[in-house]
Amino acid sequence: WQNFYNDDENSFTYVSMTGLKKEYYGLEAGLKFKVTSWLDFNTLGTISEAKNINNVNAVYMLSKSAEVYTDKAYVMNMRESGTPLTVGSIGLDLHTNGWFVNLNANYYDRIYLSYSPSYRYEKVLTNRQAAYKAYPEIFAPTTLDGMSWTEDAVAQEKGHGGWMVDLSIGKSVRLKKGSLNFNLMITNLLNNQKIVTGGYEQNSRSGYTITTGGEVNNVRVYQFSKNPKKYYTWGTNGMFQIGYRF
């Protein structure tokens, strides 16, 4: 279940979706290859799927009136959010004369945002189609044949993926008693701040108002449905450590 403030209803909304079925599967493979006695090559990749496999009937209540409503929610093929479903990594590990260097390049893709069930209610999809007919220059159609919804109408928002490079360099110095260790770690060496780490769709408020007579008016300049909330990776950052072993 979910709860959020629904601007269209001017009320907190509590949503329950029962009978929702999900599917999880994937493939992962890795390889470690010794190039020389002091250099290793590592690679790892995974591609997975974690999605809903059916549409459901949603039951929701408005806190302002305590009234309960039901509607069909078209949430089939909505993916799990907050984690990349495709990941790849290649790396080099060097160890020689007390030095060690670890360089990794990691790729992340298919990062989905948390979806909004209310944006995919049958009632809302019907209203969005009415908005398209009234303002085709602003809104997109939700159906082309009147029998089914278009793929774009129920598509889940995604985040931008990409590469992130991490570097670790260290040196171990032997002493008469114990050893001294130095380690410098730098994450996101290329300062790629375009990778999305998570977020959610902002669809609790439509870009229009439906009157009691079914007419569309009060079109808003800012369209929440086109501006999902996204979180991004930190830029380049690092840490330097000194340790003494005895």
What are these regions (language model features)?
Residues 25-29, 86-90, 163-169, 236-242:
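Hydrophobic, lipid-facing positions within transmembrane beta-strands of outer-membrane proteins
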Residues 89-93, 167, 182-187:
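Conserved beta-strand->loop/alpha-helix structural units within folded catalytic cores of enzymes
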Residues 106-133, 141-145, 160, 171-246:
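C-terminal beta-signal and adjacent terminal beta-strands/loops
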Residues 137, 149-154, 158-164, 192:
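Outer-membrane beta-barrel transmembrane domain signature
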Residues 28, 87, 151-154, 225-227:
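Short structured motifs
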Residues 19-23, 80-85, 156-163, 228-234:
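Short sequence motifs at beta-strands and strand-loop junctions characteristic
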Residues 32-34, 38, 93-97, 170-174, ...:
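Structural signature of outer-membrane beta-barrel channels/translocons
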Residues 4-5, 10-117:
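Gram-negative outer-membrane beta-barrel transporters
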